[in-house]
Amino acid sequence: MTLLQFAGLLLVWLVCGGFILTLTWREFRRVRFNFNVFFSMLFLLTFFFGFPLTCILVFGFDVEVVPAEYLLQALLSAGCFYAIYYVTYKTRLRTRHRAPSRPAFTINRIEAHLSWMIMALVALITVSVFFLHNGFLLFKLQKYSQIFSADVSGVALKRFFYFFIPAMLVVYFLQQNMRSWLLFLVGTVAFGLLTYAIVGGTRANIIIAFALFLFIGIIRGWITLWMLALAGVGAIVAMFWLALKRYNLDVSGSQAFYTFLYLTRDTFSPWENLGLLLQNYDRIDFQGLAPVWRDFYVFIPSWLWHERPSVVLNSANYFTWEVLDNHSGLAISPTLIGSLVVMGGALFIMLGAVMVGLIIKWFDWLYEKGRQEENPYKAAILQSFCFGAVFNMIVLAREGLDAFVSRVVFFCVIFAACVLVAKLLYWLLDSAGLVRARKGPACARSSLKHCFVGNDS
């Protein structure tokens, strides 16, 4: 990369990044938090945060990167994608004021508590089973890629570990105070560190728990933007340290700074992967929507589908194996835009931007329903569902649309199943006469139906 090419890339980076940052800041000042703000920050992080790191690697360590023309295409495609996304998100699809609709479901106090207990049990039981089969993989494996080898059993169980976080979110939303907020941080980060050691270096649960803690603090006004910035720097350093442990790296001096730059870029902002994909554009055989349904294969156990393909050719694996001919054992993240290019080229970038705008719009609608819900138990369930889907949005920005669709469907099914089981258990308890009246001063001040645990709302 020459200085002239760097100057051109810097100009485009400033214009596109400034455009997205301005819109995000305006939205933040208006609402403090919604999923448009969150996705916009993720988008900035994924496609723009890595540019300065790449430049330092190029000019400070003489690292060879993707040719500048493809990096330029990556920045321009990110800017165009966000513009289409933002217009879609802001387009009103129906009138603002509508007559109140009949609630689709109700939740009482016992059902809410049973729901979070079941989700926590799902996570704890699957972690325990995985541990009994494999032990602490962090101290047993020589390379991180060995996590995906045949020597590790019960890999499918990892997808259930995450449900500890929405369980703790329900606990927080049932009693929204600073004590519950701090307990959420301690509980979820401790669980994340446990899964980090057991699985062998997976940091997702730690990152998500800390991010949710910060966003809740911003919403409630318990932390300021300066505190958020300092926490972000601390999180980057912590993720770097965990990455060193994951890859068994021992570095110092300038080598440590170099390692910090490329690991931080690859962890938070794999934007160069999009440039690399665009560089190999002529080698792509467009996959259509096939990567979306192929990604569901990982959720089907082999004992249920004996002929299940051993290789799941989603957009990340197609990019890694077929386009780059890389068989190192780890898939290279194509990013959201890259996955759309794999599916259908430039046309799919525009269609994908519209679809993502509608997805984020739906999550914001559901989140607002949860905030306005008068029943505190139903509100806790709705808001924990929305915040629990944060992991899926990180997958959307980093891994692509196909990975997002399969994971969000899985999350919805398991979350809904936990709530349905909770309602069934409550019905059985109520039928057995085990639901007793709540006695105390509150009963004297409320209607008869609210004195019963089962009808508390």
Curated annotation (Swiss-Prot):
Q: Tell me yes or no: is Transmembrane helix among this UniProt entry's keywords.
A: yes
- Which pathway does it operate in? Bacterial outer membrane biogenesis; enterobacterial common antigen biosynthesis
Q: Give the transmembrane ranges.
A: 3-23, 41-61, 65-85, 118-138, 154-174, 181-201, 206-226, 227-247, 340-360, 377-397, 408-428
Q: Which GO terms describe its biological process?
A: enterobacterial common antigen biosynthetic process
Query: What InterPro entries does the entry give?
Result: WzyE
Q: Which family does it belong to?
A: Belongs to the WzyE family.
Q: How does it assemble?
A: Probably part of a complex composed of WzxE, WzyE and WzzE.
State its role.
Probably involved in the polymerization of enterobacterial common antigen (ECA) trisaccharide repeat units.
Q: Give the protein name, as stated in the record.
A: Probable ECA polymerase
Gene behind the chain: wzyE
